[in-house]
Amino acid sequence: MENDLKRFLDAKKREPRLLGDIERHLMRRPLGDRSTTVLHPSEIIKNDFCYKYSYYLMTGGVSKKEKPNLRLQSIFDEGHAIHHKWQNWFHEMGNLYGRFECKHCHTSVTGTSPTVCEGCGDTRMEYKEVTLVDDKLRIAGHTDGWIKGIGNDCLIEIKSVGAGTFRYEAPELLLDNDGDIFKAFNSIKRPFRSHLLQGQMYLELGKRMFGDEAPNEIVFLYELKADQSYKEFTVKADYEIVDRIFFKAEKVIKAVEAEVMPECNLNPEEGCKSCNLIP
């Protein structure tokens, strides 16, 4: 028994065989180059969106970014893989509209499920989603897809769901189901609030860009990471749900144009966790 305990403790002290190298590799990778000169729907829908900090970033301020550790990067990559899987199915079906890029010569084309590159004839076309922008308000985002040929056009948002999703979006579902994520997933009856706001923003941005040609509904595709269970929710466009979000964007852009930094809208006296990072 004593020898078993010693071997166990010795094993705990051993240097990792491969994990350390992977972690160092991830730390050496450059950070993503997400623009800070536009407002991203995924950011401005948050309750902790700060006018002052957004002004700082949009006027040349540098955001404090930390590289994700191995676990967090694995979570991100798993989500990306789930997105790609669903998008690839719609591409194979011939229903996926948006911008595609040839993986060989990088020729870009906008269309519905192209199968061959017009530039070089290669068949490896990578989906680059649909960019939705409002130039006046400097809002820019990417919806996960625009589906054509299956009834009326619709946008799609693909969401991978795990325990962390429930803790952040709907902790009550975990509590009501005794922490069982499988039961919690089955009990989801509608899109989570932040997903709904993001989707409604994409619908409104689409309307502002494409007018009557824009989709009037969005389909949320939820997949449970643990066992690949899935759900879908269809939501019609309703601008009233996000009018206050666009109002927030307008407040920030007016401040940027006037070159006057606004006060923190979350805590005017002491500032918030975001704007307190401003040097």
Model-derived features: where do they sit?
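Metal-dependent nuclease catalytic cores that hydrolyze phosphodiester bonds in DNA/RNA
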Residues: M1-L155, G162-D178
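Long, contiguous hydrophobic alpha-helical segments, chiefly transmembrane helices and signal peptides
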Residues: G141-T143, I158, H195-M201
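A structural motif
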Residues: I156-I158, K248
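Metal-dependent nuclease catalytic regions and adjoining charged, substrate-binding loops involved
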Residues: E2-R7, Y168-E169, D178, N186-L196, ...
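Residue-level recognition of conserved beta-strand positions in structured domain cores
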Residues: I158-S160, Y222
